[in-house]
Curated annotation (Swiss-Prot):
UniProt signal peptide: none
Enzyme Commission identifier(s): 7.1.1.-
Name of this protein: NAD(P)H-quinone oxidoreductase subunit 6, chloroplastic
Sorted UniProt keywords: Chloroplast, Membrane, NAD, NADP, Plastid, Plastoquinone, Quinone, Thylakoid, Translocase, Transmembrane, Transmembrane helix, Transport
Enzyme kind, highest EC tier: translocase
Main location: plastid
Assembly with partners or alone: NDH is composed of at least 16 different subunits, 5 of which are encoded in the nucleus.
Reactions catalysed, as given in the entry: a plastoquinone + NADH + (n+1) H(+)(in) = a plastoquinol + NAD(+) + n H(+)(out); a plastoquinone + NADPH + (n+1) H(+)(in) = a plastoquinol + NADP(+) + n H(+)(out)
Taxonomic placement: Eukaryota, Viridiplantae, Streptophyta, Embryophyta, Tracheophyta
Amino acid sequence: MDLPGPIHEILMLFGGFILLLGGLGVVLLTNPIYSAFSLGLVLVCISLFYFLLNSYFVAVAQLLIYVGAINVLIIFAVMFVNGSEWSKDKNYWTIGDGFTSLVCITFVFSLMTTIPDTSWYGILWTTRSNQIVEQGLINNVQQIGIHLATDFYLPFELISIILLVSLIGAITMARQ
């Protein structure tokens, strides 16, 4: 969005704060329904970031696919699971949880040290969507495809990975 600088920064900070609160809610809430609603809040905040970054198509795709479909699927799967099954476990911390936390923390710190040292110049696309063909000669579907393959390649791939993980999680929950 073309917003003045201070308003844009305030919306980014507000979205980041709500995103962090929602992420903590996903991880820390013991009721899976509340956790699923927190996940929906996180996905809406991610969509807000895409809107603020002028990626309207990716933002709408984020809302439709993740909030509209995946989050509803997760909520239905959680609602079909027996409620007493979640309240039986009183052991909140196991060795597997500690190992998983250690692996996640190691992964996050390795990303935090690797990303600033990476030369992003070689990764950037040398062609942009406006250099491929004249915009007036192609229709809207082709423009969307060109933008997805050039300008929005990284967000599109990240969204597809998140979709894959969500589907695997939903299938795993449905099997149990």
